[in-house]
Design a protein with these regions (language model features):
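Alpha-helical transmembrane anchor segments
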Residues: 17-20, 24-38, 47-49, 59-63, ...
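Short helix-terminus and kink motifs of transmembrane alpha helices
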Residues: 62-70, 75, 79, 158, ...
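Intracellular alpha-helical coupling/juxtamembrane segments of multi-pass membrane proteins
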Residues: 71-88, 185-196, 202, 266-272, ...
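Solvent-exposed, non-transmembrane helices and loops of integral membrane proteins
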Residues: 85-119, 263-312
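Structured inter-helical modules in multipass membrane proteins
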Residues: 91-209
């Protein structure tokens, strides 16, 4: 996507270079013929191209609005994907038990697996909409069995959502989350699936080709008639004037054409890869910070127990101390060991 405010002049007019070349050649040809053969009797009233230009302006304005609405809806949907992805990760780390009251390697693997899947889903959806290789470069987010399953499916983003829904049911069966938490997480997945459907609707809904054809034909007619209307007033300046007026209409038309398809891997596209990278950074940081917080909580509780002498005690190596502790506690212990009082 174009992010710079100052777009190069070459880039802008590079989009209409062939059309402008045709207009320039045609305008020069009309000027030469008009002067060489003194075709002053060929005179088209200026009102004709004026009315035609007004109609074209209205049609181009309508088309530009429709194209921008499609582009803005695509950006709005991906903004919702960002929010729901963060919500999903937050729910995962907050709903599931923390390390200080539930220690289970399978639980930690579940949280990491779900967050990796969500990150991979965002990248995969962008590639899916652009009709690229959807799983290329995403091997680190899925294990071998998941990749083998995804390769067998046609709609890989939908298959990833299905994998996450199955894991939510597993978490419910294992007791890692309760029924209410499972419903809330499933609602977030449903919103993500809805966003995917909206993107696919925009992608697969083609802008009416007849509408574009009629506008283009009207513009060509306008360009053909315009030199005959102004050459008698401006003479040789007809060439740059026709080029300038035509360029305005052509640029607006090209802008609408590019905006109407926001998932075609063009500079004017919705920046899906950049958005997915933002989600990747946010979710990875959230998971790592939560894991570090749990480690600190566990260490803090451990140190607190040691300071208060509640759980752990250090045995002395001297025989007297061992005898005293043996009399007091009446328990058999070993040297240089920790034991529970």
């Amino acid at each position: 996507m174009l992010l710079e405010k100052n777009i190069p002049f070459k880039y802008v007019f590079g989009k209409i270079k062939y059309e402008i070349t045709f207009v320039a050649v045609y305008a020069i040809f009309i000027t030469v013929i008009y002067k060489a053969y003194e075709l002053t009797h060929i005179n088209i009233p200026f009102a004709v191209p004026s009315i035609l230009g007004t109609v074209i302006s209205l049609l181009l304005g309508f088309r530009s609005n429709q194209a921008y609405d499609r582009w803005w809806e695509a950006r709005h949907v991906w903004g919702a994907i960002v929010n729901d992805s963060r919500t999903f990760a937050r729910q995962l780390v907050s709903f599931t038990p923390s390390a200080n009251n539930y220690v289970d390697s399978n639980l930690e693997a579940f949280k990491k697996r779900m967050i990796n899947r969500q990150i991979g889903w965002c990248y995969c959806l962008g590639k899916h909409l652009r009709k690229q290789r959807t799983l290329q470069g995403l091997e680190k987010y899925f294990d071998k069995n998941e990749l083998a399953y995804l390769k067998q499916t046609d709609n890989k983003p939908a298959a990833i959502v299905d994998l996450m829904a199955r894991d939510l049911q597993l978490a419910l069966d294992e007791g890692w989350i309760n029924r209410f938490q499972q419903i809330e997480l499933d609602r977030t997945l449903t919103r993500l699936c809805d966003a995917m459907g909206k993107c696919e609707r925009i992608k697969n809904t083609v802008f009416p080709s007849t509408y574009s054809l009629y506008i283009h034909l009207a513009m060509m007619l306008f360009i053909i008639l315009l030199p005959f209307s102004i050459i008698q007033f401006v003479g040789m300046f007809e060439v740059p004037l026709v080029i300038a007026i035509s360029a305005c209409f052509l640029l607006i038309e090209k802008m609408a054409i590019h905006l109407q398809d926001p998932f075609e891997n063009k500079p004017t596209d919705t920046p899906m890869t950049a958005i997915a990278q933002t989600i990747d950074n946010n979710l990875t940081q959230l998971y790592l910070l939560n894991a570090a917080k749990e480690d600190r909580q566990t260490l803090s509780i451990f140190e607190n127990y040691i300071e208060n002498g509640i759980v752990f005690d250090r045995l002395d190596t001297s025989s007297n101390n061992r005898k005293n502790k043996s009399n007091q506690q009446q328990k058999e212990v070993k040297d240089d060991q920790y034991y529970v009082l």
